[in-house]
Amino acid sequence: MNISVSMNKFDSKIKFVQLVFVDINGMPKGMEIPASRLEEAVTDGISFDGSSVPGFQGIEDSDLVFKADPDTYVEVPWDNVARVYGFIYKDNKPYGADPRGILKRALEELEKEGYKAYIGPEPEFYLFKKNGTWELEIPDVGGYFDILTLDKARDIRREIAEYMPSFGLIPEVLHHEVGKAQHEIDFRYDEALKTADNIVSFKYITKAVAEMHGLYATFMPKPLFGFPGNGMHLHISLSKDGENVFMGEEGLSEIALHFIGGILKHAKALIAVTNPTVNSYKRLVPGYEAPVYISWGYRNRSALIRVPAFWGKGARIEYRCPDPSANPYFAFAAVLKAGLDGIKHKIDPFAYVEENVYEMSEEKRKELGIETLPGSLGEALEELEKDKVVKEALGDAYKNFINYKWKEWESYLEYLEEKHMPKDTKKVTEWELERYFFL
């Protein structure tokens, strides 16, 4: 978008523009400027203190600059403000730890190989009443696909969907999820960078609408023990010269199979990025549809990677372990880098399954070469430290990310020790609610 065009889009009521980026956790950060400074934000950038942003700079060298991307300009329908995403710079160069910049560079590497990545997410969330404590009240008792009186939140879902096009998101399916007060709104796939932006926007819209109704929306992976967790399955495909290269004559192409092979090979390290919280691993337990075993299959929802039945031009894979606590820019960069590694080195997929993996004996899983995903954030971080490809995907953010997450894990272990709780507890603790509820 030409900046002069974007300036002409201003509604007279728009007086301020929010400059939005995300921190190491994927949490939106930013600042507001008068609308008259938008052109300056695009051309010269607006400086800010990077030491105040989790995972960015230290106080001894904290000056960063945000440059707005005018193509992302939107006006917030319920407020007299506009929003814009952008890229971060340091010393007049792209800042190496900028999450959005990291994904941009990963996509440029894909493009050098002739590929363009498309991703469609399925983010799940809960709606709660909060009464001043961490006793979460459930406002409805609906279940999966309920559309009758048990589903009290249908109007809230519709309102969220009505606002989404104003932010460039196209809603496709709205429904109640399995858990009481759990919901899902799927939106149309797009190019990977746009989809990552869309995830940040979707969480913003959902939380804002929930608040209008006196509720809290949480994307925390497992807010309640004994209830289904919030996932964010990713539907992924690659195109080349406008054609879906995952499309084979029957089923998937060789490129798609190698892409799967790359993800399977790096799955143990990837999970530290796609499921980056202590709480994430309380969702990834047997008994629910969240995957635990490293496997793949056609139509099989017990596998880590499912190939949906829609082949031909709609050919894609569904990566089922990610959750909405992930920083979408980091997660997409890591997954695409792993898949590209599979394509470059022609890694064949392994651990193909047609039956329910959870119902297999341990002996059968071993025979098929099916391994288990890390069972905790600590285990996942150990795997990440050993994986060159996934580490490189995070670029200059890797060091800050791994250090930040190790401190997070150690803080949790200290809490458990203080409360005399076992390290492998699957109970959702107050420590987790305080830390992750508003992610």
Curated annotation (Swiss-Prot):
It holds the Pfam family Gln-synt_N. One of its GO terms (molecular function) is glutamine synthetase activity. L-glutamate binds at G229, R283, E289, R301, R320. Its EC number is 6.3.1.2. GO terms for cellular component: cytoplasm. Keywords: ATP-binding, Cytoplasm, Ligase, Magnesium, Metal-binding, Nucleotide-binding. Residues 12-93 form the GS beta-grasp domain. This is Glutamine synthetase. It comes from Pyrococcus woesei. The gene is glnA.
